[in-house]
Amino acid sequence: EGVALVHNLICGALTCVGGGTGPRYTPYHMPHRTEVMGFMTVLHGDDRFYNNIFVQKWPSDDIITMHDSDDGFDTENRAAGTWMFDEYPTYDEWISQFDFSKPADMAKLYGAHEGKLPVWIEGNAYLGGAKPSKKDVNALISDVAREDVRVELVQKEDGYYLDTNVYELIEGFKNRMIDSDVLGKAFEPEERFENPDGTAIRFDSDYFGTHRGVDVIPGPFAGAEEAAKVLY
């Protein structure tokens, strides 16, 4: 809840989304500090996914873990992408539940108050079978098979490199520049996504500090040339 993922290369799956918390109270903090500002139940949602590349690098079958104490089992998702947010509302869907022209009917709004918060999903690329959310705006969904998508971390004498063809697979796809104004405010603290010094974030530079230019592509690098450089 209150997460912003922007310009990442994600080869794994998002697990335990929407579960594992129950209606417990969880602390949130003062902006850029560690003091507790208040407590709030975890509703899930209020998440933002912009300009990421999702890759189904490994098989998508769920992981099954048997219980030690009984005959039950737990399942853990291994399907990459944002598909698990299909049933989460967009902001317009969520805000439409509230009528600000008259006093609130708390009994009528019980479901809205306990329901999931909205999500913002835009400009992501899905490769090798990674599945998009139906809420994704301007998504690239590739039909290239998992085995034909290459993402490997390679060690050489002078450091680590990324051996990948993802920038060939997303060639020609672009989205808008993301900044603090696009991300808005997290729901519960009502604070903007910003730099530690309180200034606005503008995602106009890539992993190496290279300017993204007017054609903004998803992922951590401004282009294929940058992706071929030594990482560290």
Regions found by a protein language model. Name each.
Residues 1-176:
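Glycine- and acidic/polar-rich repeat regions and solenoidal domains
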Residues 41, 149-220:
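C-terminal accessory segments
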Residues 214-232:
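Short, surface-exposed, low-complexity cationic segments
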